[in-house]
C-alpha cells in the first residue's frame, strides 16, 4: 500500500493547483510564526533559497529567450512591442496621476525622524537616466552576475540579430538551450509553496506588523492607491485595448503573478513566473520574451505611486502649498523617476529626494522621508512589486490579444 501512495502524493504535489498549494503554504507560514518564532525564523531558509533560485535563473532565462526569439524570427512576422511599451508608459503616468488625486483626497502627514542611514540618492534626473544608459553598455558577464536586465537585453538583442545570419544548426542549438532553461524555470516554480511558507514565516517572526501601525493612514493611502490602479485604472486601459470585459484577465494576472511578486518582493525574481503565465495564456513568444524583462525594468506603476504619495506627504507635513500645474509636473517627474528605479540601488525610495527637490525640500528632510519608506517597506515594497510585476504580464497579454482580434477580424472581412 505504501509503495502505491507515495508516488500518488508526489504526483499531486507536482501536478496539483499551484495557487491552492501557495494558499496552504501562506496559512501554514502564518500559523508557524504565531506558534513558534524560532522555528519560523529557521524555515526562512526555504524562502531565501526559493528567491535565490528565481534570481539565479532569471538572467540566463532572459538572455536565452530573447536570443532564441530574435535569431529564429521569420521575416515579416510582427511583434507587439510598441503598443506594449506605450501601455507601460501610459500606465506608469496614470498611476502617478492617480496617486496625486488620492493624496489630495486623503492628505497624509509624516512623523519625521533623523534615522535615514548611510544612503546616497542620485543627485538629479540626469544622473538617473545616465545610470540607465550606462547599464546598456555593461559587460555581458557582469550584467548576468548582477542581474542588470537592461544590459542583458542589449546583448541578447545584439547576439540574436547576429545569429540570424548563422546556420540552422546554430539556431536550433540556441532554441534547445532556451527550452532547457525554460524547463529549469518550471521546476523552480513548482517549489513556490515551500518558498512562500518560508518567506511568510520568517517575515512575521522577525519584523511583524507592529511597527506599521504608527503609519496606518499613510499605508492606507499607499495601498489604497495601488488597489485603485490595479482594479480600476489598469482594467480601463486593458478594456481600451481589447474592447471586452478586462476583469478575467486582470484577476488572473493578479492571482498568478501578483501573489508571487508580493512575497518575493522582486520584479527580477518574478520574471520566470510571468514568462510561464504568458506561455499558459498562449501569447506570442517573440513578444513576451522581450516585453516581460523590459517591463521589469521600466514598467513601474507601483514605484510612481510610492514616490508621489510620500513626496506629497512630506509637502503636507511642511505645509507647502501645491497648485494643479505643480501636481501635474510631479506626476511627470515621478513617472520618469519610476522608469529609472531599476537602475538605482534602493529602488523607488531613493528617488524620493528628486521629487522632493521640486518643492525646495532639503536633502536632510527628504532622507527622513526615505527612512519612513524603509520602516513601512515590509508592506509597501510587497504591494509595489505585486502591482509592477502583474502589470507587466497584463499589458503584454492585452496587446497580444488585441493584435489577435485584429487579425481575426481582418481574416473574416477577407
UniProtKB/Swiss-Prot annotation:
It is found in: Cell inner membrane. One of its GO terms (molecular function) is neutral L-amino acid:sodium symporter activity. It catalyses: L-serine(in) + Na(+)(in) = L-serine(out) + Na(+)(out); L-threonine(in) + Na(+)(in) = L-threonine(out) + Na(+)(out). Pfam families: SDF. Its main location: membrane. PROSITE patterns: NA_DICARBOXYL_SYMP_1. It is a multi-pass membrane protein. The keyword Cell inner membrane applies. One of its GO terms (cellular component) is plasma membrane. Residues 2-15, 67-83, 164-179, 239-299, 353-414 are cytoplasmic. The keyword Kinase does not apply. Keywords: Amino-acid transport, Cell inner membrane, Cell membrane, Membrane, Symport, Transmembrane, Transmembrane helix, Transport. Residues 37-45, 105-142, 201-217, 321-331 are periplasmic. The chain crosses the membrane at residues 16-36, 46-66, 84-104, 143-163, 180-200, 218-238, 300-320, 332-352. Involved in the import of serine and threonine into the cell, with the concomitant import of sodium (symport system). This is Serine/threonine transporter SstT.
Amino acid at each position: 500500500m505504501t509503495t502505491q501512495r507515495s508516488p500518488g502524493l508526489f504526483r499531486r504535489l507536482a501536478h496539483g493547483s499551484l495557487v491552492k498549494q501557495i494558499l496552504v503554504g501562506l496559512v501554514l507560514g502564518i500559523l508557524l510564526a504565531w506558534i513558534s518564532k524560532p522555528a519560523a525564523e529557521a524555515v526562512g531558509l526555504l524562502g531565501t533559497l526559493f528567491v535565490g533560485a528565481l534570481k539565479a535563473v532569471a538572467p540566463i532565462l532572459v538572455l536565452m529567450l530573447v536570443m532564441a526569439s530574435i535569431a529564429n524570427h521569420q521575416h515579416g512576422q510582427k511583434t507587439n512591442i510598441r503598443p506594449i511599451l506605450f501601455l507601460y508608459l501610459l500606465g506608469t503616468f496614470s498611476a502617478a496621476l492617480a496617486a496625486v488625486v488620492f493624496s489630495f483626497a486623503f492628505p497624509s502627514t509624516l512623523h519625521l525622524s533623523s534615522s535615514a542611514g548611510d544612503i546616497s540618492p542620485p543627485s538629479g534626473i540626469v544622473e538617473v537616466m545616465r545610470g540607465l544608459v550606462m547599464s546598456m553598455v555593461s559587460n555581458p558577464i557582469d550584467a548576468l552576475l548582477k542581474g542588470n536586465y537592461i544590459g542583458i537585453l542589449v546583448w541578447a538583442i545584439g547576439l540574436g540579430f547576429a545569429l540570424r545570419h548563422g546556420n540552422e544548426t546554430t539556431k536550433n542549438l540556441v532554441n534547445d538551450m532556451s527550452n532547457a532553461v525554460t524547463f529549469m524555470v518550471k521546476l523552480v516554480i513548482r517549489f513556490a509553496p515551500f518558498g512562500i511558507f518560508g518567506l511568510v514565516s520568517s517575515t512575521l517572526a522577525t519584523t511583524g506588523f507592529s511597527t506599521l501601525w504608527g503609519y496606518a493612514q499613510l499605508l492606507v493611502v499607499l495601498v489604497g492607491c495601488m488597489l485603485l490602479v490595479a482594479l480600476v485604472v489598469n482594467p480601463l486601459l486593458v478594456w481600451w485595448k481589447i474592447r471586452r470585459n478586462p476583469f478575467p484577465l486582470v484577476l488572473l494576472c493578479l492571482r498568478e503573478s501578483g501573489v508571487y511578486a508580493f512575497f518575493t518582493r522582486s520584479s527580477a525574481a518574478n520574471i520566470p513566473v510571468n514568462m510561464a503565465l504568458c506561455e499558459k495564456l498562449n501569447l506570442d513568444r517573440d513578444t513576451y520574451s522581450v516585453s516581460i524583462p523590459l517591463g521589469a525594468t521600466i514598467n513601474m506603476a507601483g514605484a510612481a505611486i510610492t514616490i508621489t504619495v510620500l513626496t506629497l506627504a512630506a509637502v503636507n507635513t511642511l505645509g507647502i502649498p501645491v497648485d494643479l500645474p505643480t501636481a501635474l509636473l510631479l506626476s511627470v517627474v515621478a513617472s520618469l523617476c519610476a522608469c529609472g528605479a531599476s537602475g538605482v540601488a534602493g529602488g523607488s525610495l531613493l528617488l524620493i529626494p528628486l521629487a522632493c527637490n521640486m518643492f525646495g525640500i532639503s536633502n536632510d528632510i527628504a532622507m527622513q522621508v526615505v527612512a519612513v519608506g524603509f520602516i513601512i517597506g515590509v508592506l509597501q515594497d510587497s504591494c509595489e512589486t505585486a502591482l509592477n510585476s502583474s502589470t507587466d504580464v497584463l499589458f503584454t497579454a492585452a496587446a497580444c490579444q488585441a493584435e489577435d482580434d485584429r487579425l481575426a477580424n481582418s481574416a473574416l472581412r477577407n
